[in-house]
């Protein structure tokens, strides 16, 4: 799964003292958490907003648009305007009665056409750049930052296919302008240069997957090194991890949430195990017993014996005696049997008038004595058997403890028993597992193996007994823990990256947006360290949430081109610009003509700085 092949020279440079940083079981789990493998909760959806490359796309768009539209001179704009005005004057003869309105409509038509042409040229070509595929992934950059605080980067050459695309982009930006105006040509040329730099930078740097990189720490030189496909690559350590006793602890949001995430995940796992165990059908062992054999005997006697069979009567007596657990019940059964049997006896004492007890009384006395003697013998026999079993139990317990001590000694540190290596590994894993974040099965095994745990019902002495026994159907609650984890995710991401929530009128959060601190913390290192886009200016938090159309309007309104056009409008149409009457003003090209008095009252504006440069 992981590409960890490092060449021989690199491995020699690392030495035996190198501490592995990634991939390790802990670091891989951090990336798996970001992918939603463990306890994905609602609060983690904010991370999807965090890794959205829309803010970086707006930054690139703002840079290209601002740089291109600002690369024009006052002389170019004036030349294009004079050229346009000359064409209009040839087609439309001048009329002094409507000269002011004519000038206003002419200049408004030219300025609007210029704005639309520039916007179409810029947006069409910038969109091609933004929506073309690049090898540099902003999403992977955010994954590395949130998981480890370090970002590996690989430099790669520009492909021939990309060179062809850049050449075709030059043809679209420079050679196909409408009218071949100077302003459009200058803007198109600068757009091509800026776009070429952006495309080459975004396609010459590659952020690999977390499964393709090996990162190690060299204590001797106090540096972190990264390897990709056997060769050393750049590694940007933005948030250095803490290393103590060979254990690496990253300074990242996911590392801080790790404990709580796995507590929630193991609770959900425990709840699922309990659900599966408690919903299983009850199981019972069915076998033949001697308790119900008397029913077959009674049925056989009922079919084959006479109506009054002594064997059946005696068997019924025994059955009724076995079903009664109290002395009064036994007495009633005996009384009933004697009453039935006395009716068939001939009482000689009563017949011949001899004194003494009657036959019924003698039978009753005989039967009672016999039954009591049988019960007494049975009870004594049960007590003797219980005493024997207790002695046997104590003997076997001593043997078991002796065997456990011998087994523990053989499985302890330094034991070389190959047959016991597998149980030793299992016992060691169960002993080292974290009860809160470890595997549920291993945690249960650890608890059962603990000498201080009393998880089973047992009777070890004469005075101990089981007070209660039951089957528990407990399922641990996970809803509250999931809710707490959601709030913890939100709090961690909001406070680490200084995100700003956007809510509706009811106070419900709709989405989150980048603040100025978020741009400095997250977007700044990506722009200047990873992508190496030094000419690009960081986008403001206002532009980070605006749509492309709103960004275009804002950038054009504050651009050099808009200022030049506005200045030309004030000089060419002073009445409409100042709000006064519609005076007639000559074009700027006719510099020797006199200006009207109301125009002289206000000093003419000097060309902005950089005009003609």
Curated annotation (Swiss-Prot):
Record key words, sorted? Host nucleus, Viral genome packaging, Viral release from host cell, Virion
Disulfide linkages recorded for this protein, renumbered to the chain, are none
Where is the stretch described as Disordered? 577-613
Query: Which GO CC terms are listed, alphabetically?
Result: host cell nucleus; virion component
Where is this protein primarily located?
virion
Compartments, record wording: Virion; Host nucleus
Secretion signal span: none
A Pfam family that the UniProt record links to this protein = Herpes_UL6
Organism's domain of life? Viruses
**GO terms under biological process:** chromosome organization
Q: Where is the composition biased (Basic and acidic residues)?
A: 592-605
InterPro entries named in the record? Herpes_Portal
Keyword GTP-binding tagged? no
Assembly and partners are described as: Homododecamerizes. Interacts with terminase subunits TRM1 and TRM3.
Name the protein family: Belongs to the herpesviridae portal protein family.
Functionally, this protein is described as follows: Forms a portal in the viral capsid through which viral DNA is translocated during DNA packaging. Assembles as a dodecamer at a single fivefold axe of the T=16 icosahedric capsid. Binds to the molecular motor that translocates the viral DNA, termed terminase.
Q: What is this protein called?
A: Portal protein
